[in-house]
């Protein structure tokens, strides 16, 4: 059985796309490695169509309404004390850009689907990744998609919650339709740090709980099969429910993992620098889901990755310009 989302019971699951740090605790037919969950189409008919062919409506000219502007400049990316793939830190010049204040919601994504007739990867495959809290493993749930995150037999997703069960391909298609794009993970980190070389761990400061209040929708519980609901949400929460960060952004830690534009690769100077697979993209931010990295997954520097056709119930995105 799956814990049902209610606006007062929604809580966590980790699997960064997001499974860079978690997935070793489950066996999933989507896994291509112990740290990735991927969907492999068994028939040619299941392969993703070209995004341009799927988007029937003419892409809009992007609007910066609801976006935060960042001036850009020099920033130190990564962490000396973080996970191996966050090292070594290096200087990066970021050009000026805009980033959505909020995650793309179910309501936002519905407008895209209605305007274009787009079919997501989850709909093409007929299933998507959902975590079974009782059994303690990931499953491909038939019929789970952006509209029915726990399957068609369960309630629809709330319109003001972040859209989930969207692959990198799906996020790219939405961004193109909206006249925007996905942020690079370096832009994402710059924004999470509010453009400053700060020592703060998170986008809001150094503590997950401030004056008795949780600052983000994050996992509470001793293990992945023993969730507690101390922040008010069992699974996803409405976008912005935990307030704005100093940058003006919301949900830059927890709630859902966020797809980034770039291919995942080792940082300059690392043993894996230059090694990459174009089918594996970066993701940032952590989610409501349990993570073996624990609180580290919500930091501004933590990295995750997954394949472009993977969709999960704790993965979403926001757009940039």
Predicted feature residues:
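Low-complexity, intrinsically disordered short segments enriched for Gly/Pro and polybasic residues
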Residues: 1, 16, 224, 306-309
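Positively charged n-region of N-terminal signal peptides that target proteins for export
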Residues: 2-13
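Extended beta-strand/loop cores of jelly-roll/beta-sandwich
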Residues: 6, 25-186, 306-321
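Short alpha-helical segments used as structural interaction elements across diverse proteins
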Residues: 8-9, 281, 300, 315
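Short, surface-exposed loop and linker segments with low hydrophobicity and enrichment for Pro/Ser/Thr
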Residues: 14, 94-97, 275-276
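Sec-dependent N-terminal signal peptides
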Residues: 14-21
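Mature extracytoplasmic/luminal segments of secretory-pathway proteins
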Residues: 21-22, 202, 257, 316
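Functional-site microenvironments in short loops/helix caps that host divalent-cation chemistry
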Residues: 70, 76, 81, 119, ...
């Amino acid at each position: 059985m799956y814990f049902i989302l209610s606006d007062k019971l929604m809580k966590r699951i980790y699997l960064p796309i997001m499974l860079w740090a978690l997935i070793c605790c489950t066996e999933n037919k989507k896994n291509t490695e112990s740290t990735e969950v991927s969907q492999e189409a068994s028939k040619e008919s299941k392969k993703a169509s070209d995004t341009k062919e799927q988007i029937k409506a003419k892409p809009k000219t992007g609007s910066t309404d609801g976006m935060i502007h960042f001036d850009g400049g020099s920033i130190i990316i990564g962490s000396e004390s973080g996970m191996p793939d966050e090292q070594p830190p290096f200087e990066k010049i970021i050009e000026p850009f805009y980033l959505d204040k909020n995650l793309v919601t179910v309501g936002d994504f519905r407008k895209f689907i209605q305007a274009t007739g787009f079919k997501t990867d989850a709909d093409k495959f007929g299933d998507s990744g959902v975590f079974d809290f009782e059994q303690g493993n990931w499953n491909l749930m038939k019929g789970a998609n952006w509209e029915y995150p726990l399957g068609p037999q369960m309630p629809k997703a709330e319109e003001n919650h972040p859209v989930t069960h969207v692959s990198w391909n799906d996020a790219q298609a939405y961004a193109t339709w909206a006249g925007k794009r996905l942020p690079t993970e370096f832009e994402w980190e710059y924004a999470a740090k509010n453009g400053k070389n700060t020592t703060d761990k998170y986008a809001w400061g150094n503590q997950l709980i401030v004056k008795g209040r949780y600052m983000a929708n994050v996992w509470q519980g001793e293990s992945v099969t023993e969730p507690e609901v101390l922040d008010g949400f069992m699974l996803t929460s409405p976008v912005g429910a935990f307030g704005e960060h100093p940058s003006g952004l919301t949900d830059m830690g927890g709630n859902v993992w966020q797809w980034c534009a770039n291919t995942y690769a080792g940082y300059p100077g690392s043993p894996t620098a230059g090694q990459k697979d174009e089918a594996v993209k970066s993701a940032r931010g952590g989610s409501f889901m349990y993570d073996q990295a624990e609180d580290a997954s919500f930091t501004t520097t933590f990295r995750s990755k997954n394949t472009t056709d993977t969709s999960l119930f704790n993965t979403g995105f926001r757009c940039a310009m």
